[in-house]
């Protein structure tokens, strides 16, 4: 049923030349329906880009965690436990200073606790990208 509804939405958007905003944690739905994706954490943009680029090369640790937590159907993965992003979501009325994901992030740096990262390379809000060079 879900596939039928999503196919209908895609067809209507194409016929009418419109767009749709889907809000979901279902990475499969995103992969099948979205041209572009924005990943939010605590109401703030963590990563944005073309769906293929974000799903094949996630740059923000939260996006990486979401993708790692997606069930797979490959035989070699069926007996493996799904990845869980550590910790819990912060209270949205008490978002910490710095990166909102820093308390759950496995890759934090001292700067993550102090300053909210800007969107770097027009792609992800993460201090880990600050010193990277080249084209993404």
What is each PLM-predicted segment?
Residues 1-78:
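P-loop NTP-binding/switch modules centered on Walker-like glycine-rich loops
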Residues 50-136:
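Charged, flexible cofactor/metal-binding loops and thiol motifs
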């Amino acid at each position: 049923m879900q596939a039928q509804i999503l196919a209908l939405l895609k067809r209507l958007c194409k016929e009418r030349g419109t767009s749709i905003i889907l809000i979901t944690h279902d990475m499969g739905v995103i992969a099948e329906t979205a041209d572009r994706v924005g990943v939010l954490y605590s109401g703030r943009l963590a990563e944005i880009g073309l769906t293929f680029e974000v799903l094949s090369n996630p740059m923000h640790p939260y996006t990486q965690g979401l993708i790692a937590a997606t069930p797979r159907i490959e035989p070699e993965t069926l007996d493996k436990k799904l990845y869980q992003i550590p910790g819990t979501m912060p209270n949205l009325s008490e978002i910490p200073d710095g990166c909102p994901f820093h308390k759950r992030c496995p890759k934090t740096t001292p700067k993550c606790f102090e300053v909210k990262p800007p969107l770097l390379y027009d792609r992800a809000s993460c201090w880990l990208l600050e010193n990277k060079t080249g084209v993404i």
